[in-house]
């Protein structure tokens, strides 16, 4: 039986690969997509998500979400993904539009209609998820779990300690981590290992139309290089759903720093239980890299 999922995203070049996997992995049933400001503005992430859905002829409803963080000024990652978020490929024009309600309400409505609890996957800042949990707490029993790409038990990638998705809206992340729902965190501990090799990247143009499109986008992606390999951060959240055996997880207490001058956005991961607090997050700490690379090749071969 396919696993029903809702995907909250901020495309973003590596988001495009994660979306492909969510659509084409035979184990998954992607039922709803929502967008959030993150890598670029929410108008751009929505446009990019609709372009991808049209490219793959995927009839999946999409709702536009939060344009700004809960309490602070927005930041983006255009330096990594380009000004548009997905430069490098000329997508065909289309007339698709997002559905006419905010993302967190679209998630609420879809959860309440679902015949069974649904897995939420968030691969951008957690603003929409925080709005859902704070404004619609009645939805919690209908959430099977939340799988996120975000955080780190050590070094960051946008500050010395903070990972971008958490640092973009620390208050939202703090709200989510305090919510009591089951959370799996695929952070930089594993995503920095999730590298597509130059040899594999060179085969993409001959793989299929998706391979050609991704190869064009990758030429503008700044999380690595075509010569040294590219990190597939967001794809790890999808990979865990399909191949949890590739990941080493540890239940930990995790809190989000929202006040520090130099540490705001840091995920404080209590690996050794120093704080004596109960675990609230299953933290991915290691990855079977070869197995991950093999799975990526298999799923992208299906993305015709």
Curated annotation (Swiss-Prot):
Bridged cysteine pairs (disulfide): none
Molecular function GO terms recorded: purine nucleosidase activity; uridine nucleosidase activity
Keyword Hydrolase attributed: yes
Database matches in Pfam families: IU_nuc_hydro
GO BP field: purine nucleobase metabolic process; purine nucleoside catabolic process; pyrimidine nucleobase metabolic process
Annotated EC: 3.2.-.-
One of the record's GO cellular component terms: cytosol
Residue spans crossing the bilayer: none
Active site (catalytic residues): 233
Enzyme class per UniProt: hydrolase
Superkingdom to which the source organism belongs: Bacteria
Keywords in alphabetical order: Glycosidase, Hydrolase
InterPro entries: I/U_nuclsd_hydro_CS (IPR015910), Inosine/uridine_hydrolase_dom (IPR001910), IUNH (IPR023186), Nucleosid_hydro_RihC_nonspecif (IPR022976), Ribo_hydro-like (IPR036452)
Job description of the protein: Hydrolyzes both purine and pyrimidine ribonucleosides with a broad-substrate specificity.
PANTHER family found in the cross-reference section: INOSINE-URIDINE PREFERRING NUCLEOSIDE HYDROLASE (PTHR12304), NON-SPECIFIC RIBONUCLEOSIDE HYDROLASE RIHC (PTHR12304:SF15)
Family: Belongs to the IUNH family. RihC subfamily.
Protein name (database record): Non-specific ribonucleoside hydrolase RihC
Gene of this entry: rihC
């Amino acid at each position: 039986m396919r696993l029903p999922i809702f995907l909250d995203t901020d495309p973003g070049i590596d988001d495009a690969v994660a979306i492909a996997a969510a659509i084409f992995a035979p184990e998954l049933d992607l039922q709803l997509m929502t967008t959030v400001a993150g890598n670029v503005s929410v108008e751009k992430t929505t446009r990019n998500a609709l372009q991808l859905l049209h490219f793959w002829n995927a009839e999946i409803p999409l709702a536009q979400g939060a344009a700004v963080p809960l309490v602070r000024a927005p930041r983006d990652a255009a330096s990594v993904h380009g000004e548009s978020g997905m430069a490098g490929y000329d997508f065909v024009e289309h007339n698709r539009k997002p559905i006419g309600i905010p993302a967190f309400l679209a998630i609420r409505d879809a959860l309440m209609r679902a015949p069974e609890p649904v897995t939420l996957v968030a691969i951008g800042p957690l603003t929409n998820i925080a709005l859902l949990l704070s404004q619609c707490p009645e939805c919690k029993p209908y959430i099977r779990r939340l799988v996120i790409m975000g955080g780190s038990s050590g070094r960051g990638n946008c500050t010395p300690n903070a990972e971008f998705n958490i640092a973009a809206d620390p208050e939202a992340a703090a709200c989510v981590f305090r919510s009591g729902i089951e959370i799996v965190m695929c952070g930089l501990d594993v995503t920095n290992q999730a590298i597509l090799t130059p040899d594999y990247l060179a085969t993409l143009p001959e793989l299929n139309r998706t391979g050609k499109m991704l190869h064009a986008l990758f030429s503008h992606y700044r999380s690595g290089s075509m010569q040294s390999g590219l990190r597939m951060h967001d794809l790890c959240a999808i990979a865990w759903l399909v191949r949890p055996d590739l990941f080493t997880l540890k239940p930990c207490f995790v809190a989000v720093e929202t006040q520090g001058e130099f540490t705001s956005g840091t995920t404080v991961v209590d690996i050794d239980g120093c704080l004596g607090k109960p675990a609230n997050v299953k933290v991915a700490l290691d990855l079977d890299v070869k197995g991950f690379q093999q799975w990526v090749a298999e799923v992208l071969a299906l993305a015709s």
